[in-house]
């Protein structure tokens, strides 16, 4: 426990907060190029083939990013936009690819939560 005099002289050290997505370097999104697109399996007790991509960002950092939604058009050398946000059952995946921007297409036939998946508003039925 410091004395008042010691606090006047030195002050207290502020704890530096650790960011959940360090590769973004305080930017909301970053652009990158896919170096590998593949599927991986989640932790127990879940079971699936989750689509992920290894992405080299514009700041030369390479990260693993999740491809959300059903179906995608990504392959090696596709240019993608990355945002923060981890996938709880995939260890080491701390970023999401933004659907509907740059080379990434939006999810086809998506009706709900469209803005999260880059899907356009569906046309109303003609017979109305």
Swiss-Prot record:
With S4 and S5 plays an important role in translational accuracy. Interacts with and stabilizes bases of the 16S rRNA that are involved in tRNA selection in the A site and with the mRNA backbone. Located at the interface of the 30S and 50S subunits, it traverses the body of the 30S subunit contacting proteins on the other side and probably holding the rRNA structure together. The combined cluster of proteins S8, S12 and S17 appears to hold together the shoulder and platform of the 30S subunit. The keyword rRNA-binding applies. Belongs to the universal ribosomal protein uS12 family. GO terms for cellular component: small ribosomal subunit. Residues 1-25, 101-128 are annotated as: Disordered. It holds the Pfam family Ribosom_S12_S23. Keywords: Methylation, Ribonucleoprotein, Ribosomal protein, RNA-binding, rRNA-binding, tRNA-binding. This is Small ribosomal subunit protein uS12. GO terms for biological process: translation. The modification 3-methylthioaspartic acid is found at residue 89. One of its GO terms (molecular function) is structural constituent of ribosome. Part of the 30S ribosomal subunit. Contacts proteins S8 and S17. May interact with IF1 in the 30S initiation complex.
